[in-house]
A protein has these predicted regions:
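Acidic/His- and Gly-rich active-site-bordering loop/insert found
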Residues: 39-146, 165-174, 333
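Stable alpha-helical elements in mature extracytoplasmic
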Residues: 45-53, 68-71, 75, 154, ...
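Sec-exported extracytoplasmic/periplasmic mature domains
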Residues: 54-61, 76, 80-85, 163-167, ...
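Short, low-complexity intrinsically disordered segments enriched in A/P/G/S/L with frequent Arg
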Residues: 9, 13, 19-21
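Metal-dependent amide/peptide-bond hydrolase catalytic core
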Residues: 37-38, 214-453, 459-460
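Acidic/histidine-rich catalytic neighborhood of metal-dependent amide-processing enzymes
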Residues: 143, 149-228
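Solvent-exposed loop/turn segments at secondary-structure junctions
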Residues: 62-64, 92-94, 106-108, 119-123, ...
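Bacterial N-terminal signal peptides
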Residues: 21-34
Length: 460
């Protein structure tokens, strides 16, 4: 009865029927109605979450090889200490481990909400860091380390919100399942794809919340706080251009040089990419920010089809001989296509523009066009409400992200899937993802836990 006002407790002891009835209703509410559940002890919760994130980042769960045994053990232990029964699934020979945990909801007949995150992180160039990339030190109000932003910080937010929901006695409207995968950074073959292929019955969600999107006062438009919730992502079309020429001595230039043939093909392929047709979600983004976007690489990549020259390979011998003209040369191009763009037509257009029988264009990846999830759902509304509670003047909009995430494997099945990162980040911080000096602001990390908690206890 600690949540019942003192005056009413005294009335109940005196036996007043009305007071006793009020007490009974409130007491029942503590066990039946989420609105009457106690709030978490946030200072204690936040201190523990911060320490947990540091422990998590200190585990170098680098992919390759995606050995996530230690990371999975840490998260499993946290969940078990909170009264959950997580399950581990081994999906590969080198310690690739996935984790599932479930919090039952009020209506077990409804499909669950899936919280999706990943254990693995990309490799580091330790020499380029000014510190140990796995030390997880706190400096200048931020946690520094590989995986802090992508995506161990968000994973701890999801898990902490889930744990506090259970501790507060709040029963969500439907089951909530959390899935942590082992190899998001290698296209998910042993992670999300393996789980979907082998244990979809454990998932089968109504909605998915994953990484992607964020809030920023400068990323989308200068001086305006905008939160983007990812409702779709671009298709990944990786191409290899191979040129054939005539080998020769470097002292005697020839026209049929594979390197110059390749350079000309790259120029033709990339100088005039196919025109972009209007995409509804991009038009909605433009309206949300008032028609004017910031000019930066992230936004520019979101609004259009893009092509990046990523590798060049040529030469003869090891070490490569400078005085030998090679007979072959290769390049790879990372093409990212907007939803609805036909990848076959895009590739054919590139071949037609190159128009050189000495050059072949080979596809290295099969793009997945999963479409765009609706922003007119109860879950999207819950995310908007939770964000505006913390940031009343913010603009909340659906958006595309230029990169790929695990959620595409579920969106392709028609499941509404969202990239939801409830933190305000500047462009410099966002740029550290997969780069050097990766970090996450402590204040925003902790605020994100509260926002996630509000979303999970909503009606969706």
């Amino acid at each position: 009865m600690r949540n019942i006002p003192r005056r009413r407790r005294h009335e109940c002891r005196r036996g007043t029927p009305r007071a006793c009835a009020t007490t009974a209703i409130v007491t029942m509410g503590l066990f039946c109605c989420p609105l009457w559940a106690a709030e978490p002890d946030w200072p204690v919760v936040e201190k523990h979450a911060l320490e947990l994130l540091q422990k998590y980042v200190r585990i170098a769960s680098v992919n390759p090889p995606a050995n996530t045994v230690e990371a999975a053990a840490l998260i499993k232990g946290e969940l078990e200490a909170a009264g959950f029964t997580p399950k581990l699934y081994s999906s590969g020979p080198d310690g690739q481990t996935n984790l599932i945990v479930r919090l039952p909801g009020r209506d077990r007949s409804k499909k669950p909400l899936l919280l999706l995150n990943h254990f693995d992180v990309v490799p580091v160039d330790a020499k380029a860091w000014g510190m140990d990339p796995f030390a997880a030190i706190i400096k200048d109000g931020q946690i520094w380390g590989r995986g802090a932003l992508d995506m161990k910080g968000l994973a701890v937010e999801q898990m902490t919100a889930l744990i506090e929901l259970k501790r507060a006695g709040i029963v969500p409207p439907r089951d909530i399942v959390m899935l942590s995968t082992c190899d998001e950074e290698s296209n998910g073959k042993l992670g999300i794809q393996w789980m979907v292929n082998n244990h979809f019955d454990e998932l089968d969600p109504a909605y998915v919340l994953d990484e992607g999107g964020a809030g920023s006062r400068e990323l989308f438009t200068p001086g305006k706080l905008v939160f983007g919730i990812a409702v779709g992502q671009k298709q990944s079309l990786w191409l290899r251009l191979s040129a054939k020429g005539t080998a020769g001595h470097g002292s005697q230039p020839i026209a049929d040089n594979a390197n110059t043939i390749l350079m000309d093909a790259i120029r033709k392929a990339m100088n005039a990419p196919p025109a972009t047709k209007p995409v509804p979600v991009v038009e909605e983004m433009k309206r949300a920010v008032g028609g004017t976007f910031a000019n930066n690489k992230f936004v520019n990549a979101t609004l259009d089809n893009t092509m990046s020259l990523t590798t060049l390979q040529s030469g003869v011998g090891s070490p490569v001989k400078v005085n030998v003209i090679p007979s072959t040369a290769e390049a790879t191009i990372d093409c990212r296509l907007l939803p609805g763009v036909n990848a076959d037509e895009f590739q054919s257009d590139i071949k037609a523009r190159i128009n050189d029988p000495r050059v072949t264009v080979e596809r290295l990846s099969e793009p997945v066009d999963a479409g765009v999830s609706s922003s007119e759902t109860p879950l999207f509304a819950a995310m908007r409400t939770a964000l505006l509670k913390e940031h009343p003047t913010a603009v909340v909009m659906p958006m595309l992200v230029p990169y790929g995430t695990d959620e595409v494997r579920l969106r392709i099945r028609g499941i509404p899937s969202y990239g939801f990162m409830p933190m305000v980040l500047d462009t410099a911080t966002i740029a550290t993802m997969h780069s050097d000096q990766e970090r996450i602001p402590v204040v925003e990390f902790l605020r994100g836990i509260r926002i996630y908690f509000d979303v999970l206890r909503s009606d969706y």
